[in-house]
Swiss-Prot record:
Biased composition regions of type Basic and acidic residues, renumbered to the chain: 1-19
Region (Disordered): 1-35
InterPro entries: DUF697, UPF0283
Record key words, sorted: Cell inner membrane, Cell membrane, Membrane, Transmembrane, Transmembrane helix
Higher taxonomy: Bacteria, Pseudomonadati, Pseudomonadota, Gammaproteobacteria, Enterobacterales
Gene Ontology CC terms, in alphabetical order: plasma membrane
Top-level taxon of origin: Bacteria
Pfam families tied to this protein: DUF697
Gene field: ycjF
Membrane association type: Multi-pass membrane protein
Protein known as: UPF0283 membrane protein YcjF
Principal cellular location given in the protein's record: membrane
Transmembrane stretches, start-end: 70-90, 100-120, 213-233
Record family assignment: Belongs to the UPF0283 family.
Compartments it resides in: Cell inner membrane
Length: 353
């Protein structure tokens, strides 16, 4: 005997359908499009780099503006007028046999010649600094290029500018690692991994030394005026040292443009309360509580010196930063705190003896 049919059961919620993954349509690039393809530039600037880093970039990187062109044009016109007037005075003095005026014209010509030579030298140094920015852009393009033939000549030019001899072990390892089948990206990458770290290590040592000197000088110095003068002098020397390591010679005008940033740095060294408050972001609360006011001020000034050196190093390098080879402020912070601890311990132990 058959069983009776069960009544229908109605559910309040509808049945859930299993989600099906939707695939995107395949995208293919032709050979012509692949040649013109360029990866999008990604801003790798850390979040902590703000107004201070922009000020360093503005101070170190040469600019071109309409105001500057107008001033240079006015100076050129004034110089041409002075030369023309000098020639006229010389001719009049020669015709009238006024030897005193003729001697004055000769002295003026020597002074003008020296001034023109200084201007030409300064322009050449600014042009060299501007060329370094172009070389860095060219290196960035080569690091994303698959062409062949430009990488080796470019790297050899960088080594020559930096004063690296052909017999240098790092350069010899680079020559041994490259071969004809490698493209420009691989050759420049090998140079960045084998040769460029030699100069970067020297620049790091200079930054560490100058930052430590700034820290210790402020800790032991009782006069704020001496602190400010010392910070200004050491910061300018640090910029010059880093530029020399990378084969760049800074001129008088470049130093004037850096002076604004140095003033910001020495003002920080002279404001102990501000340094102590900002220093909480760089070191822990317990360590800041154990350190004295002068020690906290010294660490703050040393960190600013290190930050200035890092930015100068970045703008003087012929190659962009690759992976994580950019020096970090935290590395110098740990070194400064360690050196300061040793100095304070030695100063405490010496009176006991």
């Amino acid at each position: 005997m058959s069983e009776p049919l069960k009544p229908r059961i109605d559910f309040a919620e509808p049945l859930k359908e299993e989600p099906t993954s939707a695939f995107k349509a395949q995208q293919t690039f032709s050979e012509a499009e692949s040649r013109t393809f360029a990866p999008a530039a990604i801003d790798e600037r850390p979040e902590d780099e703000g107004v201070a880093e922009a000020a360093v970039d503005a101070a170190l990187r040469p600019k071109r503006s309409l105001w500057r062109k107008m001033v240079m044009g006015g100076l050129a016109l004034f110089g041409a007028s002075v030369v023309g007037q000098g020639v006229q005075w010389t001719m009049n003095a020669w015709q009238t046999q006024d030897w005193v005026a003729l001697g004055g014209c000769a002295a003026g010509a020597l002074i003008i010649g020296a001034g023109v030579g200084s201007v030409v030298t300064e322009w050449r140094r600014l042009w060299r600094l501007r060329q370094r920015a172009h070389e860095r852009d060219e290196a960035r393009e080569l690091l994303h290029s698959h062409s062949v033939g430009k990488g080796r000549a470019f790297c050899e030019k960088l080594a020559q500018q930096a004063g690296i001899d052909q017999s240098h072990p790092a350069l010899q390892r680079w020559y041994a690692a490259i071969h004809e089948t490698q493209n420009d990206r691989e050759i420049v990458g090998l140079y960045a991994n084998l040769v460029q770290p030699v100069l970067d290590a020297q620049a790091r040592r200079e930054i560490s030394r100058f930052a430590a000197e700034s820290t210790l000088m402020i800790v032991v110095s009782p006069l704020a005026l001496v602190d400010m003068a010392f910070i200004a002098w050491r910061n300018l020397r640090l910029i010059n040292r880093i530029a020399t390591l990378y084969g760049i010679e800074l001129g008088y005008y470049s130093r004037l443009r850096l002076f604004r940033l140095v003033l910001l740095n020495i003002a920080f060294a002279g404001a102990s309360e501000l340094v102590r408050e900002v220093g909480m972001d760089w070191m822990s609360q317990d360590l800041a509580a154990r350190l004295s006011t002068r020690a906290a001020q010294g660490i703050g000034a040393g960190l600013l010196t290190a930050r200035l050196g890092i930015k100068a190093m970045e703008l003087c390098r012929p190659l962009p930063w690759i992976d994580n080879d950019k020096p970090r402020l935290g590395d110098f912070r740990r070194q400064l705190i360690g050196q300061l601890k040793e100095t304070l311990q030695k100063s405490k132990s010496s009176p006991e003896k």
